[in-house]
Amino acid sequence: MTSHPRILRPFTLPNGTELKNRLLMAPMTTCTGYFDGTVTSELVEYYRARAGSIGTIIVECCFIDDYGLAFPGAIGIDNDEKVAGLAKIAAAIKAEGSKAILQIYHGGRMVDPQLIGGRQPVAPSAIAAPRDGAATPRALSGAEVEGMIAKFGEGVRRAIQAGFDGVEIHGANTYLIQQFYSPNSNQRDDEWGGSRDNRAKFPLAVLDITH
């Protein structure tokens, strides 16, 4: 660190938020949430122990819809009842002087039906992920696509209510946002599919509503 002293200097974001240094902890899945997506005390203490010396902590991805959890022990931000638990994480991080960021996502076709009570996953198109045993998802209707965008916006509202300093949108790892952009998983023939510009509409709409 002594050979790169700028890393430890404060950094001010364009919106005026000052980070104590330029170190960030990436969002790493712990699979320690309750079965219903609520926060455990172990998870709160996990983040408390890592806060303080690092400038910003990005908390592991939170599903924005109850069809969206991609792994066991995932935490959610899909309803207002989840806010209280998430607020404990944000408070623990900020009490140590670090900024708290929450990553939000939807797993789309990468969701195992067993994680959502045996229901069929949803995705841009009814095309299964290229992996053994993957379920064929149900294609979202146009109205459901609009509703999903709104759910990302609601996720941001809840993150702010919980006291987080910011939100990171998870648009990688072949989850729902990336599924809309890829022609391998998006073969829709409406305004949300087809051309690259149309396939980019969902990611851009999510960005717009969460900005």
Region spans (language model):
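Feature marks short, surface-exposed loop/turn motifs that line or immediately flank catalytic pockets
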Residues: T32, D65, G108-M110, N173-Y175, ...
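Alpha-helix-loop-beta-strand connector modules within alpha/beta enzyme cores
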Residues: A74-I101, Y181-H211
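Substrate-binding cleft of carbohydrate-active enzyme catalytic domains
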Residues: I93-K94, G153-V167, D208-H211
